């Protein structure tokens, strides 16, 4: 189940994933990195997303997936990401979020950056991300750092998006 945007857990900073012991669930069971990857991938695809963070399904650890929901083989796992270098060039572009259904707003983000992270197999590597993939990656990384979707937008863009969502909801009610 996807956690809605007003859930206070989305404002918490997630703890690093421990590959040696896995993630301990509330019921005491242990979740492996591989199992978490497949859980996230399944939820992302089911919700037609391009990224999903563990905290968005109530698992407060530093992990997410990104990829194209129409191509399951494109989905990659990201565990314990750390930005290495960030380009100063930025671009403003519209974003949405699975935890905020129907809400789209313009957000300013760096065009490219270099990051180090591990896959679900625990193997770490460094990669450069650019363009749309960089935007999705940083959006999911914000979730891990407790930074909410709407806090990244300017006040103007937030008001504009909120008004548009209200208008769409009114139209749906009368349809």
Task: Identify the meaning behind each predicted range.
Residues 1-175:
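Positively charged
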């Amino acid at each position: 189940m996807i956690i809605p945007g007003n859930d206070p857990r989305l404002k918490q900073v997630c703890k690093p994933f421990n590959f040696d012991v896995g993630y301990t669930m509330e019921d005491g069971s242990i979740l492996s990195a591989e199992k978490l990857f497949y859980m996230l991938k399944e939820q992302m695809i089911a919700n037609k997303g391009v990224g999903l963070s563990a905290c968005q399904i109530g698992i407060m650890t530093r992990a997410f997936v990104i990829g194209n929901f129409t191509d399951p083989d494109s989905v990659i796992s990201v565990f314990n990401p750390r930005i290495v270098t960030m380009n100063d060039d930025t671009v403003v572009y519209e974003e949405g979020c699975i935890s905020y259904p129907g809400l789209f707003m313009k957000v300013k983000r760096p065009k490219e950056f270099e990051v180090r992270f591990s896959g679900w197999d625990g193997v770490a590597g460094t990669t450069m991300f650019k363009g749309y993939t960089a935007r999705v990656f940083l959006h999911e990384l914000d979730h891990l750092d407790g930074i909410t979707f709407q806090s990244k937008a300017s006040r103007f863009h937030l008001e504009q998006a909120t008004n548009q969502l209200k208008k769409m909801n009114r139209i749906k009610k009368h349809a």
